[in-house]
């Protein structure tokens, strides 16, 4: 890429063996800039919150975590699985310094949609340094432990975790807000020292 930039050649078209043909060099330069950033694995002050919910309890928790993280001045991408599919989540993960994952416990396990996304993300081998887990449950509550295992297998340092039996009360909501702030502060410190 450096050779392209310094060659002095006037490039009018880029036609790779695989992928789109570029005739607009302004658009190609934007894509090239993104590719350089992504291949260098530079991370931003960004947190991706991935969650799914059955009866809205986990979503309530996610919203309070989001509020806490945003109050600390970092970028937050909310990725509820009822609105985003896994490739869209993977795109947001490229430059994220933290991932916070939440799901309800279902049949002594995590919600199936989260297992799918986490398996997919694990295979992409992102270098996300920090994470946290949260979730709601009614009986057994194994979800957080399993979410934690997924993230740890990806090399993510778990900053904190919260679980709520049934609908989160005010105490749990405050804990979620603080979790968001805590992860955001870890991210800011990481980027500062990067």
Segments (PLM) and residue ranges:
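Accessory terminal helices/loops
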Residues: 1-75, 82
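FMN-binding flavodoxin-like domain, especially the glycine-rich phosphate-binding loop
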Residues: 1-21, 64-77, 89-194
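Short acidic loop-to-helix transition motifs that present clustered carboxylates
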Residues: 81-87
